[in-house]
């Protein structure tokens, strides 16, 4: 709640920037799930007294958050596609070539539903688009499942917060 309140009248823009960055731009430590849940509660009006500048309309959240998530995922895909292989080194601490090979095998075995499921796992949410791009997953397939994952992920979390906010 403090992070949303920090943005003040720019709370919606701040929320969208966080979602964009966390969805695939190599900064996996942002609290995306929590922010979406709290934003849903704010849309229900439960925390409006504490953060009157951070009021959201439910329709704004349901429209703009998936767009920010899709765009972040697409950016991550292109980062992985065009510079991803250079980022994966055999002796790297985090982005090892072995991880790219394992991710490619994971995508091959489980198909593109891994993209949808990855949305619900912090940190993984940021790395899935990068890995899909670096593993040369089909752009069309990635885009389709990125959109599905972004819409399902954001809608579920925002609506959970919204409905809980109505009963609080």
Stretches with model-predicted labels:
Residues 22-23, 143-145:
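Alpha-helical segments in transporter systems
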Residues 64, 68, 145-149, 153:
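Alpha-helical transmembrane segments of multi-pass membrane proteins
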Residues 136, 140-144, 156-159:
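Membrane-embedded catalytic cores of phosphoryl/pyrophosphoryl-handling enzymes
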Residues 16-35, 118:
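Transmembrane alpha-helix interface/packing and boundary motifs in multi-pass membrane proteins
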Residues 148-168:
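C-terminal membrane module of polytopic membrane proteins
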Residues 1-17, 41-130, 134-141, 166-168:
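Membrane-interfacial helix-loop-helix
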Residues 19, 23, 40-44, 157:
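Structural signal for membrane-spanning alpha-helices in multi-pass inner-membrane proteins
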């Amino acid at each position: 709640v403090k992070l949303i309140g920090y943005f003040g009248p720019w709370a919606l823009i701040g929320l969208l920037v966080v979602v964009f960055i966390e969805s695939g731009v190599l900064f996996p430590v942002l609290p995306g799930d929590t922010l979406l849940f709290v934003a849903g509660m704010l849309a229900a009006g439960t925390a409006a007294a504490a953060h009157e500048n951070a009021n959201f309309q439910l329709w704004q959240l349901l429209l703009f958050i998936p767009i920010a998530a899709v765009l972040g995922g697409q950016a991550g895909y292109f980062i992985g596609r065009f510079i991803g292989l250079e980022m994966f080194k055999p002796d790297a601490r985090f982005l090892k070539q072995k991880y790219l090979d394992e991710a490619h095998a994971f995508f091959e075995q489980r198909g593109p539903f891994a993209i949808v499921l990855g949305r619900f796992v912090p940190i993984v949410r940021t790395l899935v688009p990068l890995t899909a791009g670096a593993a040369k997953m089909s752009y069309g397939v990635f885009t389709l499942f990125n959109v599905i994952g972004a819409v399902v992920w954001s809608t579920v979390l925002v609506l959970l917060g919204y409905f809980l906010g109505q009963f609080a």
